[in-house]
Amino acid sequence: TLGRAMIRLYDVTGGTLKFEDTDITKLEGKALSPFKQRMQIIFQDPYSSLNPFMNVEELIGEPLDLREKLGKRERRERIEAMLNKVGMDESALEKYPHEFSGGQRQRIGIARALVVSPEFVLCDEPISALDVSIQAQVVNMLEDLQQEMGLTYLFVAHDLSMVRHISRRIGVMYLGHIVEISPAKELYKDPLHPYTKALLSAIPIPDPRRAREIRRIALSGDVPSPSKMPGGCPFVTRCPYAMPKCRESAPVLREAAPGHQVACYL
């Protein structure tokens, strides 16, 4: 939800969203259009995000038709070049989504998002619907494209090992609240929020000797309904270190170390 609000697929009910120095929450219509081209999304499900009645050329070309006025030849060249960047060739152009595997469909979805040369890309769990054997290939491709095209990613994921691999900076959310923000290496080395510590302790470790040295943090308590949150800290019902003041007021993000923020009273 936060990511989709950031690219204005959802309207926000409060606060500001700044792209560079412009608050895009105040923009509509033609004023917002240039920013929409600079922000794109790679959807989670490659099976439902592609129109089954459009072939690959139409799917990748549609964003170009909406955002740029290109001649037929230049349009075709842009589509072919983008298709090659995601590891597919021109033989796919006349085919339809049902003729491809899940990994190939996601590559088409990535090409569709990047063909207009955006600057900011929301990757909404782009590998969670893919076979495990393909996930690493897609992530490595996304990293290569990031370097080649100068992209900024907001990568939404629940796979903590994959998050560690692809991220430079991580924000941890609990029930819609950001509880910790940190450079990736520092977060995995020294997590500060109790929820982050519990998450990282749950990562499977293939080495049995090392696994025995890790203390798993099992959370108790009930997960509150997002529509009926408790007073104070959103994590208070499950936190093993909860104090009376945690129920009275929610802690705000504070800087615990350079670039490392945490919303906790501890």
Please place each PLM-identified region on the residue numbering:
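Conserved ABC ATPase "signature" region
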Residues: T22-D23, R73-S91, L200-S201
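Conserved ABC transporter NBD signature motif
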Residues: G15-D23
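A short, proline-enriched helix->beta-strand linker immediately N-terminal to the Walker B motif
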Residues: V115-E119
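Charged, flexible cofactor/metal-binding loops and thiol motifs
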Residues: E90, P183-Y265
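ABC ATPase NBD coupling module
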Residues: I24-Q40, L66, E186-P191, P224-P230
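P-loop NTP-binding/switch modules centered on Walker-like glycine-rich loops
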Residues: P126, L130, I134-R212
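Helix-to-loop junction immediately C-terminal to a conserved catalytic motif
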Residues: I7
